[in-house]
């Protein structure tokens, strides 16, 4: 496998560093973006939420001035000081009275700390909140103090804050060249609306040292300590557009002022502004209207008083630094912070303050590192305020990266030295350290033996390696590269230091010159401690065992090395035993006899040579390891035989495990490596085939390598497929237990519900800079961040930074369709995310309705990614889907009804010539039909109420609302046609939209009860309905519509039969109206009761030709209306024309009647769907027109 490099990609560790430093000291802080409007809050820690009572979703995107914490007791001066600190991007500490969410007050020190990037631009603000006790408040009367070191000497305090003032003691008439931004603002004119505090005292001789007085005089004027300064306009030179004096003449009479601070830093109202623009922020009169900085024309030329000197000095400065600062003002990006006015009678509103523009200026020469003041106040480390950017891991000086080329070369060198040690240490201990060699070494010294010199060099190299290990980085458990020398030393001491130290001790130097007889044995035993270096080889086997050829070579070398060690031991046994044997039967004596070099006790140099001894011993061990031996070199003594038995056992194990299973060993050791290389090869082929550019190619390879290291090449889905579902659920529950336990939305869920949820979760790993969600992507999942930090960007502007346990996505239960993302989500560090698909989550919630309500109530998204414009569109889309579903499921086609209508149309066409002559005879029946119609509608109202319980219908609600208010409710009712061929989806949508508008217009009078809302499927809020409830209500609606369809078919046939058999002449206005599709049964009941048999029998002699002309005309047009159903627009136009002509005839005929009869005659003929429908037609709102009914006029 490759070298474990750790997290070496550039990461934005800003959030992690801040949390690590602040959380350890129980800090309460928020982070705001200085480059967006209102300096919106993009992060708040848990301590701030506990202190204020607000949750993180409530605080996100709020202005960093914390207007939601303000109240009547919050002083406007404190708010202005905070705003001024934000305006000038300066550090400041303000004591402010805030309000909890429950309304209680608390006092805390608000510490504003700007965070700047490498260019010195204020990118963010860290605002820390500290509780102020009564003792602290009494001991510290200063309410507004810049952050200073904790010193008691006033001299040092003043000098630390204003180093530029020291220069003024020598240059009285000009501003310091280093910092031209120091300005003096004071005014003796106080107003009640001024933000300045009236209790600040002017400096006196007792409170100011001589140098301080000189500094003060140099800034404000030699003879004055508090001159009157009139500012006729804001001092900005951004965009000369209009004259401030012309727009706001009253501003000339009000001076901007800052009263004296009790602090030594603000003597004579001296404060440091980041630019001359900041003088504008001192005027906080609540009635003055501040304009944007781009609206200024005078460029500060109308400044009066000492500002003339300051302005001229600044504008006339020739210093490059001054001109650079002055020129950057025009390039300042603008941010607006709106401070709302307070109403004293309301408790939770903000104190009054002016609307002004707050801009975080770009001050290049200000240090962006941590100042001494911040570290002393917060007692934090040097990296408390890291730069907000991608930062590579910090490597200390003289620290070696563990994956650097130098370290790789050094490791190979040490490996060769270890191999040398493993070979020559046993050889020298067994063969070379005898009496003859020892005598020679005593005579000529240590340098006579070249092998000893090499051993000395090896020992020195091992000692150097120990020193290098103390400066070599390592990867911790969090996959982070550790470069701190102290941590490296601790890690090395706990690991391999002891082994390396023992192996590096030069024992032969320590015992050199002792001259004892035990020297040889002792040196031989101690030098074998160098074999501990072989542990390094075992430690690095995984690094060098990536290829199969290397494994084979390594196995061969291990086998040969073991044979070498055994040969040394075999010689040592024979050499030690030979002097004590009476019969020379040892293998050395046998070897001397075989080769003709016998041992002579009187001659120490007799016997076989060292070469003969070593080769023979090595031959014996190899033959014993690979087989049972050939017998030419045989063990004779008991010790030799016992050793031979051990060698045979070792040989059988090694032969069987290594040589007999080489292929199996390779497959077992390199199965993951083979998969890694196969996948890597696919990635490289993909890159080469599609010609991926180099930066993107590098990102692909780095991500693949890191993902492989993170998962170790394990495919979780493939592993889980081999287990039963019960074990899969348990494994998933274990993998996601941290999320399910820490997230509040999942608390209280049953074991089965948690197992079902765990099965749906997927874990995603993202490296730094990877974009998880792009703007405009469809939000198909809900994300839970378990490790790392991410940033959310809108138009490349950071709007939020999310950390551990944050949730982002959309509220899936509120919308029928997934929305689109309104921002980009990018990883700042290596992140682990748990995501669940939208459909999977809704499915689990549908299976566990008891958990659904708890989950939807406690689910709080830290950031909602759904696009705002998609919310209203999703409502219409869901209604459209409902209409399509109804149109697909419902069918009002009736073949028998069509045939029946065709026959009636044919019969009525024959009598069309007599319709006009008989029209006048039908007028006297209108009053009678009108009374019948009123009773008909009342009966429908009485019988409709119990029917609609448990169904989803909007008609009763519309009728009831119209009846109460007398509004023109006919259009929505008239639009809903109960055509048997189609059900207009657009009309249903219009009806729902009319209901929503009507409900908003009359929320109290016409709002139905909770039971009626539940019956109609209209919830109080959109989040009350779950997916399962909607499906259940749709099923009930489908059953009701099917039942109504069958009733409608039967009733329409009965109505048509009765209309042709009736003897009374039916007026045209009532023959055109039939019951709607929602409810049809009361019509038949009414018609049966409203036409007595007596009247039918009496008037049975009337022929069809005696009916009203309009009725016959409409009956004749029935067939044509069915044929022209596809052209609805043309049919409606023709119907309106015929109806208009009938109305004209009716008005001519009714001219002979008295006004009372004319009024009763004209009312029923007006149709509710006409634009000029009067309010008297509300009574027939419950009835709907059929396009194919015989009452519709047509050509």
From Swiss-Prot:
Sites bearing Phosphoserine, chain numbering: 174, 238, 319, 891, 894
Signal peptide: none
cNMP-binding domain, as annotated region: 745-845
Residue ranges of every copy of the PAS domain listed in the record: 41-70
SMART domains xref list: cNMP
Domain PAC: 92-144
UniProt GO MF annotations: heme binding; inward rectifier potassium channel activity; potassium channel activity; protein-containing complex binding; voltage-gated potassium channel activity
Tissue: Detected in total brain, in superior cervical, mesenteric and celiac ganglia, and at very low levels in retina. Found in pituitary.
Compartments (UniProt record): Cell membrane
Membrane-crossing segments per the record: 413-433, 450-470, 495-515, 522-542, 550-570, 642-662
Residue intervals on the Cytoplasmic side: 1-412, 471-494, 543-549, 663-1195
Keywords assigned by UniProt, alphabetized: Cell membrane, Coiled coil, Glycoprotein, Ion channel, Ion transport, Membrane, Phosphoprotein, Potassium, Potassium channel, Potassium transport, Transmembrane, Transmembrane helix, Transport, Voltage-gated channel
Record field: catalytic activity: K(+)(in) = K(+)(out)
InterPro entries with a match to the protein in the record: cNMP-bd_dom, cNMP-bd_dom_sf, Ion_trans_dom, K_chnl_volt-dep_EAG/ELK/ERG, K_chnl_volt-dep_ERG, KCNH_animal-type, PAS, PAS-like_dom_sf
Chain coiled-coil ranges: 1027-1054
Membrane topology, Extracellular segments: 434-449, 516-521, 571-614, 636-641
Motif, Selectivity filter: chain positions: 627-632
A single BP term in Gene Ontology: potassium ion transmembrane transport
GO CC annotation terms, alphabetical: monoatomic ion channel complex; plasma membrane
Origin: domain of life: Eukaryota
Function in brief: Pore-forming (alpha) subunit of voltage-gated inwardly rectifying potassium channel. Exhibits faster activation and deactivation kinetics and slow inactivation at membrane potentials positive to 240 mV, resulting in the weakest inward rectification.
Family stated for the protein in its record: Belongs to the potassium channel family. H (Eag) (TC 1.A.1.20) subfamily. Kv11.3/KCNH7 sub-subfamily.
Protein name: Voltage-gated inwardly rectifying potassium channel KCNH7
Native species: Rattus norvegicus
